[in-house]
Amino acid sequence: MPELPEVETVKNGLNRLLINKKIVSVKFDWPKGFPNSDADVNKFLVGSRIIKTRRRGKSLIINLSSMYCLVIHLKMTGQLVFRGDEQFGAGHPNDSLIGPLPDKSTRVIFEFDDNSRLFFNDQRKFGWIRLMPEVEVDNLDFMKRLGPEPLNPDFKANEFRGRVRRRKNSSIKATILDQSVLAGVGNIYADESLWMAKIHPSSLSGTLSDAKLNLLFSSIKDVLKKSIELGGSTDRNYVDAEGKKGSYLEFANVFRREGKMCSRCGSEILKIRVATRGTHYCPKCQRKTK
């Protein structure tokens, strides 16, 4: 599943190519992935123009001129593929990114007034697109459970420490993976941030000092910003909004580097399981807090 930097990269690409396009038709073949009434589609989607695309956690939100919006979650195998004067593929890459469309994985087709089209493809049918009033987005159950955006300038270290300490008996990795604590951080960036802050992934959240949590707070921000600059990662073969693979993993310090040398101390990177997830860390740099 794409994490915050990958979805942010897709958002930026969609904003570059879709703004002010008018939707003239919508077709879909999987009602569970597009659970919207024909009446709402005809009244609030068809004929609307795209105002902007934004991100909340790991979801995309496309705002429309009708004051409705499309909330999109790509899940594991979702794609957004644009075909027009320019082309791009965003999401899980397979032949659908470059081959003829629609194909057997196409679930939704948006056609615009300039004859360009946006395809939502999803092989495993876990992703979805919901049409709803803008004012109701924040009331979605999963949206209400989301924690702060890590890169929001209004999110400060003291709030971060408070949120972490409310889960004092959980491992620090489980804590920062919890979307109610932080929105958008997943396995890759949890491992990288903990390495940067020199914190063992299985350390209990309640054992970490203010100084350590402040360092982790800044490390999460730095890691996410760096990944966005590099177009995200290629975990699960994720690609960005122009069909280019993100290059973050080429610069990763621990993620998927088990058996290799730590770039900071030269020790061997190990892989263990923490919070049911494969976890990469340096045993010398990241000693467990007692």
Predicted regions and their residues:
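A cross-family signal for N-terminal binding/gating loops and helix N-caps
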Residues: M1-N121, F126-G127, M261, R277-K290
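Short clusters of hydrophobic/aromatic residues that line enzyme substrate/ligand-binding pockets
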Residues: L45, M143-L146, Y238, F255
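Basic, nucleic-acid-binding surfaces and adjacent catalytic neighborhoods in DNA/RNA-processing proteins
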Residues: K22-V41, R54, E159-K290
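Low-complexity, intrinsically disordered regions enriched in charged/polar residues
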Residues: M1-L4, P35, A39, L70, ...
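Phosphate/anion-contacting hairpin/loop surfaces
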Residues: L70-A183, Y189-M196, L204
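Generic detection of long, well-ordered alpha-helical segments
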Residues: M1-L4, P100, P150, D154, ...
